[in-house]
Amino acid sequence: MSQHVMFNAVLSSHPALFIQGEWRIGNGVSFEKQDPMSQQRLWQARAADHTDVTLACHAARAAFPAWARASLEQRATVIQQFAALLEQHKQSLARTISLETSKPYWETLTEVQAMIGKVAISLQAYQTRTGHSQTPMGDSMSVLRHRPHGVLAVFGPYNFPGHLPNGHIVPALLAGNTVVFKPSELTPWTAEETVKLWQQAGIPDGVLNLVQGGRETGEALAAQPDIDGLLFTGSAHTGYHLHRQLAGQPEKMLALEMGGNNALIVEQVKDRDAVVNLAIQSAFISAGQRCTCSRRLLVKTGAEGDAFLLRFTAVAQALRIGRWDEQPAPFMGAVISSQAAERMLAAQQHLLLLGGESLLNMTRPDSQSALLTPGIIDITNISEVPDEEYFGPLVSVIRYTDFTEALKIANQTRFGLAVGLVSEDRQQFEQLLLEARAGIVNWNKPLTGASSAAPFGGVGASGNHRPSAFYAADYCAWPMASLECEHLTLPATLSPGISFDLPKV
């Protein structure tokens, strides 16, 4: 480990909870974060127990009235100061994310840049999606306003520990909500460093609170009567659990952004290396740990498809993998933990036992590291393919005969996050748009490509119809409709059955 890393690593238990503007030591169990590459300890602290979580929610509730009544300009000033601090500390935060996730430094720099860009996008989205509008109606005015929910719990994932929670926290605060943030227990350090920047930005006490920990902390937060909503990004398994936990509480807003078993259809291969590059980016970027990564690669049967697969396999085998700060820079690093690496290897073995054919065997070169090499497995001949999101560098190949069959296969999943098409036939893309059950449908672009100026989310097991990104503003505030008239006068025409022509008493 470099001297720089040793200097910055948090190697002893410390105050890692941020509640009511103060850093506190948790009352829960001690837990630690290890470097996925070296397994050396990076961070250690005590988790938040039920008492800590309750305290954080009470702090957020107490801070809500003043924050909600502050002007939009006042709230935006704090958030813009946070963006300025992100710019100032971009490199150090990117290094922290790289250490925790093993993502290459070039990639985590883009993550912090996305966090910065989220502020301007969120301001635009707030005004576009949930702003103030009025329409004349005779002698009155129809006015639409939006009001914050109150206290929102934000659950962050580990694959983008800066960007994805930021995509909930920024619009939530902008709308006037207060927040209790529970990051993944696999990326506590990134969360701590991010909240320190919010503190420097001048966020008022209690407006943003941080509780660290695993499942017990998360369940305690979801069970809090003081929260008015919960914003979650993570696995379908955890999302379903939270949905059940909040069942029978329609008064609480629940936004679930979950994973996908995404299909990339390779219908035409005009420029072979261009298609291979797109497929590599779709399958293996971030070591396959993006919810939009292609888990299923649908390749047309025939010589063109055969040649594409040979080239795809060769390029995947030659991908540079390694430590985040190595030079030349690697394309991808390790998966998030040794346990995640073991799950991926078990998934590959399961598919092979079902009858899959390995085109490129995923391996773990060092048992003391979570680094995996890319894997490609042909599952065309498996009769009952598991409909699972294997969150790592493993892609399944399915051969098909015609486009109609490809569309059918693409939709054979309980998920509905992303689907993509490689073809120069516009009519095929139009057909895909009509038949796809997915929130993101890309044409000749990587599945992992998305715009912050568009909604991000899916259907089925990929979410509960509350897409994030530009549409996050929608669930961070509720609409208030008013009919308004400054002066009350008796209508010239009364409703039938009403008369004021009464005998004098």
UniProtKB/Swiss-Prot annotation:
Active site, renumbered: E257, C291
Q: Which positions in this protein are listed as binding NAD(+)?
A: G234, S235, A236, H237, T238, G239
Organism in which the protein naturally occurs? Yersinia pestis
Chain's role: Catalyzes the NAD-dependent reduction of succinylglutamate semialdehyde into succinylglutamate.
Q: Which PROSITE patterns match?
A: ALDEHYDE_DEHYDR_CYS (PS00070), ALDEHYDE_DEHYDR_GLU (PS00687)
A GO BP term here is: arginine catabolic process to glutamate
Return the SUPFAM superfamilies for the record: ALDH-like
Which residues does UniProt assign to the signal peptide? Answer: none
Q: Which keywords are on file for this protein?
A: Arginine metabolism, NAD, Oxidoreductase
Gene name, per UniProt, is: astD
| Protein name per the record | N-succinylglutamate 5-semialdehyde dehydrogenase
**Enzymatic reactions:** N-succinyl-L-glutamate 5-semialdehyde + NAD(+) + H2O = N-succinyl-L-glutamate + NADH + 2 H(+)
EC primary class: oxidoreductase
Could you tell me one molecular function GO term of this UniProt entry? succinylglutamate-semialdehyde dehydrogenase activity
| Keyword set includes NAD | yes
**UniProt cross-references to Pfam families, sorted A to Z:** Aldedh (PF00171)
Domain of life, per UniProt, equals Bacteria
Q: Spell out the family assignment given in the record's similarity comment.
A: Belongs to the aldehyde dehydrogenase family. AstD subfamily.
Cited Gene3D superfamilies: Aldehyde Dehydrogenase, Chain A, domain 1, Aldehyde Dehydrogenase, Chain A, domain 2
Quote the InterPro entries the UniProt record gives. Answer: Ald_DH/histidinol_DH, Ald_DH_C, Ald_DH_CS_CYS, Ald_DH_CS_GLU, Ald_DH_N, Aldehyde_DH_dom, SuccinylGlu_semiald_DH_AstD
Q: In which pathway does it act?
A: Amino-acid degradation; L-arginine degradation via AST pathway; L-glutamate and succinate from L-arginine: step 4/5
